[in-house]
């Protein structure tokens, strides 16, 4: 199981993980409303363990995404919920949650205390942590945490903000060299940077690097593609794949989302993705 400590926006990622017939545990909060109940019901239907999801007033915040006529994200605003109930869950039940997990998926722009507690537990039980970001203005303040993530996934613009450089207009080849140099000098374990239709570049602190092209598919709706990509990378690395192979899994899951109007990936068996994992009933 992968354990995800995150706000409601990461519900899609936990569903993507569950749709590869894995059994993730979701550590989060939801509203005390009918909408909150519906979220939990849907996650349970996907065979997600929701034992550590707390219902609190205003627990899901408000999220608005604006898309242009090509279906690409043009802007977004958000009102974040109070996430401290997640910290209380980790303080009370963190040992049992993390000790049973195969790895941890963590939102980087979550409260610092939650990040610190998660890393503390991950270190205690020798678990890998994979990071992703939604609110860049908050995440950039947490830049010093990058070296604690076994792998971090972001897009081209976010990577530019992290490294205080402008990557607009860079080719995949150019960006790959730049990211590799930055990752090696900053001693960040590994990073994957998505480039939309141009695919993704990846690099680790040992100097391994590469480019993985996007799959040529008919684009119906890009909503959720980044979440599926990240879920695929985290799944691959959790179960022993090299960075390139993990990016390949992420690319496949992202393509499966883009070609439909659904914002989560369809069901896959682990063996279809080259994963030698027994599926739990």
Predicted regions and their residues:
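Conserved N-terminal subdomain of the carbohydrate kinase-like
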Residues: 19-102, 271-281
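Alpha-helix C-terminal capping segments
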Residues: 12-23, 236-240
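Conserved phosphate-binding/catalytic region of the ribokinase-like
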Residues: 169-281
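Conserved phosphate/ATP/ADP-binding segment of small-molecule kinases
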Residues: 123-128, 133-209
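Short beta->alpha connector loops
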Residues: 32-33, 109-113, 134-138
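Single conserved hydrophobic/aromatic residue that forms the stacking wall/gate
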Residues: 1-6, 10-13
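Surface-exposed amphipathic alpha-helices with a cationic face
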Residues: 18, 116-126
